[in-house]
């Protein structure tokens, strides 16, 4: 039989105090909704239907082309949300997972186990439950002496005995699909909230003597539903621990994993060393034996093997093998650094390609440049690429030596093996093998300093 999935993502999330739909708030680099969608993939659903509502267009954009969508224009409860999927799923034979889009910590393994449990026990409905020493506020799972599920009782309706139950409802379920939609026709809004509850379906199945079961999560953290910023931070913390643990098991060294922030899609090779307060975001890839020191921040970038990045920022760029960057360097988007390049302290590179073995040791700006191999930038070199309206390109050939405190005004080209004298302002192309000097001639006026106030003779 087929599996189907319904993801509930229509809510506004008032307690988040945000214009962004709740399910689009991010945990470890991707939205909560994407986390749930990826985990749902473990059950290989034939159809996945996502119920949208508040700012539906934003939610649909995130999963465009990956799921079918239905709209819940009025948020009238979880049962009502599932009703919205009727045109797509009613009458199909199979098992349907119903899950909230604000549960980013649920794993694919747990959802697969839930489905298997449901099928193996021939249940018409199976509740995903968890156990906690502090069940206050959760619906409790009431079982009989044979451990069969009798009902779900909410906190406000629970007896003193029922309040002692530690098994709680996580809000995730599996149903026989055909029976689900038959039962939905019989639920109503006769409750304090005036809403249709999916839990009422469980009651209907019990009344008709059909088999209802419960599968208990091994890890309570997976049950977390995010309703406010506090829970969002908790989810981020748990996810970060999971991610860092995975990398450590796979051969990555962390000085302080609790103070290291790595997004879920980051890839890290063997023998990488990561110090505290390192952040790796987006689609970043780190090559083997690279060292990332305290304070390094890398976004959507590829760093090769054996690199050393010291307290620096790299954004949307590629860094080849053996490169050293920092401290206090900034590699801005659309830059590429060739093998063995050295970018030192207080150097900024923007939108530039730099050939292998090139060095910019300190206090340099390289913007909109095409730089060859074995180039040396002296301290204080500035490539001037912007005239207030347009940006221009500088081309620097191989084996060029740029003296300290030089200003290179684009558009300009420095030929192979050329040399720029220290303190020069370069406004014209420099031919290959030439020396360019663009500075005022030094004039010494003998004894002139004796006329000035600072001279000891005038004190």
UniProtKB/Swiss-Prot annotation:
Pfam families in UniProt: Hexapep_2, NTP_transferase
Catalytic-site annotation from UniProt: 362 (proton acceptor)
A GO CC annotation given for this chain: membrane
Keyword Magnesium: yes
Chain positions covered by the region annotation Pyrophosphorylase: 1-229
UniProt subcellular location: Cytoplasm
Catalytic activity: alpha-D-glucosamine 1-phosphate + acetyl-CoA = N-acetyl-alpha-D-glucosamine 1-phosphate + CoA + H(+); N-acetyl-alpha-D-glucosamine 1-phosphate + UTP + H(+) = UDP-N-acetyl-alpha-D-glucosamine + diphosphate
PROSITE patterns with a match to the protein in the record: HEXAPEP_TRANSFERASES
First-tier enzyme category under EC: transferase
Pathways involved: Nucleotide-sugar biosynthesis; UDP-N-acetyl-alpha-D-glucosamine biosynthesis; N-acetyl-alpha-D-glucosamine 1-phosphate from alpha-D-glucosamine 6-phosphate (route II): step 2/2; Nucleotide-sugar biosynthesis; UDP-N-acetyl-alpha-D-glucosamine biosynthesis; UDP-N-acetyl-alpha-D-glucosamine from N-acetyl-alpha-D-glucosamine 1-phosphate: step 1/1; Bacterial outer membrane biogenesis; LPS lipid A biosynthesis
Cofactor requirement: Mg(2+)
UniProt cofactor note: Binds 1 Mg(2+) ion per subunit.
Gene Ontology terms: biological process: cell morphogenesis; cell wall organization; lipid A biosynthetic process; peptidoglycan biosynthetic process; regulation of cell shape; UDP-N-acetylglucosamine biosynthetic process
Ligand binding (acetyl-CoA): 379, 385-386, 404, 422, 439
Residues that coordinate or bind Mg(2+): 102, 227
EC number: 2.7.7.23, 2.3.1.157
Region N-acetyltransferase, annotated ranges: 251-459
GO MF terms held by the record: glucosamine-1-phosphate N-acetyltransferase activity; magnesium ion binding; UDP-N-acetylglucosamine diphosphorylase activity
Source species, domain of life: Bacteria
Keywords: Acyltransferase, Cell shape, Cell wall biogenesis/degradation, Cytoplasm, Magnesium, Metal-binding, Multifunctional enzyme, Nucleotidyltransferase, Peptidoglycan synthesis, Repeat, Transferase
Similarity-based family: In the N-terminal section; belongs to the N-acetylglucosamine-1-phosphate uridyltransferase family. In the C-terminal section; belongs to the transferase hexapeptide repeat family.
HAMAP family linked to this entry: GlmU
Subunit structure comment from the entry: Homotrimer.
Function according to Swiss-Prot or TrEMBL: Catalyzes the last two sequential reactions in the de novo biosynthetic pathway for UDP-N-acetylglucosamine (UDP-GlcNAc). The C-terminal domain catalyzes the transfer of acetyl group from acetyl coenzyme A to glucosamine-1-phosphate (GlcN-1-P) to produce N-acetylglucosamine-1-phosphate (GlcNAc-1-P), which is converted into UDP-GlcNAc by the transfer of uridine 5-monophosphate (from uridine 5-triphosphate), a reaction catalyzed by the N-terminal domain.
The protein, known as: Bifunctional protein GlmU
Annotated source species: Streptococcus pneumoniae (strain JJA)
């Amino acid at each position: 039989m087929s599996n189907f999935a319904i993801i509930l993502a229509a809510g506004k999330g008032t307690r988040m105090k945000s214009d962004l739909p709740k399910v689009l708030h991010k945990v470890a680099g991707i939205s909560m909704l994407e986390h749930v969608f990826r985990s749902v993939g473990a059950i290989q659903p034939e159809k996945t239907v996502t119920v949208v509502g508040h700012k539906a267009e934003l939610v649909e954009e995130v999963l465009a082309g990956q799921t079918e969508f239905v709209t819940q224009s009025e948020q009238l409860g979880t049962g009502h949300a599932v009703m919205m999927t009727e045109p797509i799923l009613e009458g199909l034979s199979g098992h349907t997972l119903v899950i909230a889009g604000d549960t980013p910590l649920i794993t694919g393994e747990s959802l697969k186990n839930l489905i298997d449990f449901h099928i193996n026990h021939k249940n018409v409905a199976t509740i995903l439950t968890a156990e906690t020493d502090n069940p206050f506020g959760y619906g409790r799972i009431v079982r009989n002496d044979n451990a069969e599920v009798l009902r779900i009782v909410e906190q406000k309706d629970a007896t003193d005995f029922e309040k002692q139950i530690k098994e709680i409802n996580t809000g995730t379920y599996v149903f026989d699909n055909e029976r689900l939609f038959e039962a939905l026709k019989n639920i109503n809004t006769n409750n304090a909230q005036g809403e249709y509850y999916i839990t009422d379906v469980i009651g209907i199945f019990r009344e008709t003597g059909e088999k209802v079961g419960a599968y208990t999560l091994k890890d309570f953290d997976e049950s977390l539903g995010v309703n406010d910023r506090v829970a969002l931070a908790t989810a981020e913390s748990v996810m970060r621990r999971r991610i860092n643990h995975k990398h450590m098991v796979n051969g990555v060294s962390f000085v302080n994993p609790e103070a290291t922030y790595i997004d879920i899609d980051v890839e890290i090779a063997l023998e990488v060393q990561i110090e505290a307060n390192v952040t790796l975001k987006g689609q970043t890839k780190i090559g083997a034996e690279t060292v990332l020191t305290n304070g390094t921040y890398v976004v959507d970038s590829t760093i090769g093997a054996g690199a050393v990045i010291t307290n620096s920022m790299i954004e949307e760029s590629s860094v080849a093998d053996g490169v050293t960057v920092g401290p206090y360097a900034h590699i801005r988007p659309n830059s590429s650094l060739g093998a063995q390049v050295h970018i030192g302290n207080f150097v900024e590179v923007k939108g530039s390609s730099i050939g292998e073995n090139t060095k910019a040791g300190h206090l340099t700006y390289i913007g909109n440049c095409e730089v060859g191999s074995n180039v040396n930038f002296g301290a204080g070199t500035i490539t001037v690429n912007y005239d207030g309206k347009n940006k221009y390109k500088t081309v620097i050939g191989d084996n060029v030596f740029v003296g300290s405190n030089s200003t290179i005004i684009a558009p300009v080209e420095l030929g192979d093996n050329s040399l720029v004298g220290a303190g020069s302002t370069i406004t014209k192309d420099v031919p290959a093998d030439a020396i360019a000097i663009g500075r005022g001639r030094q004039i010494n006026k003998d004894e002139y300093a004796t006329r000035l106030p600072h001279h000891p003779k005038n004190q």
